[in-house]
Curated annotation (Swiss-Prot):
Protein name: NADH-quinone oxidoreductase subunit K 2
Enzyme Commission number(s) of this protein: 7.1.1.-
Superkingdom of origin organism: Bacteria
Subcellular location: Cell inner membrane
Organism: Geotalea uraniireducens (strain Rf4) (Geobacter uraniireducens)
GO cellular component: NADH dehydrogenase complex; plasma membrane
Gene: nuoK2
Function in brief: NDH-1 shuttles electrons from NADH, via FMN and iron-sulfur (Fe-S) centers, to quinones in the respiratory chain. The immediate electron acceptor for the enzyme in this species is believed to be ubiquinone. Couples the redox reaction to proton translocation (for every two electrons transferred, four hydrogen ions are translocated across the cytoplasmic membrane), and thus conserves the redox energy in a proton gradient.
Assigned protein family: Belongs to the complex I subunit 4L family.
Catalytic activity: a quinone + NADH + 5 H(+)(in) = a quinol + NAD(+) + 4 H(+)(out)
Keyword Transmembrane: yes
Amino acid sequence: MLALNNYLILSAILFSIGTIGVLVRRNAIVIFMCVEMMLNAVNLTFIAFSKYLGNIDGQIFVFFVMTVAAAEAAVGLALMIAFYKNRESIDVEDVNLMKW
């Protein structure tokens, strides 16, 4: 069995990769994937602490985070489809809501 530190290090690495992806990338789909990676890193942390402490609250909270992530993905993809139909691009630099 792996120690808690291993899970926390993996979670920190995943969260850092996701943060760098959000800050560096310009494609909206890649940004949404990086946000999902960050949410999964948080879920991994919740599960690791839940297992370490012997408490089920962290595992229950993961279901709430997954529900919010699914709703965020659905709304985000719908907005990207609408934006692509309007502008034929999904670059975040092309998004300017004042010019619609």
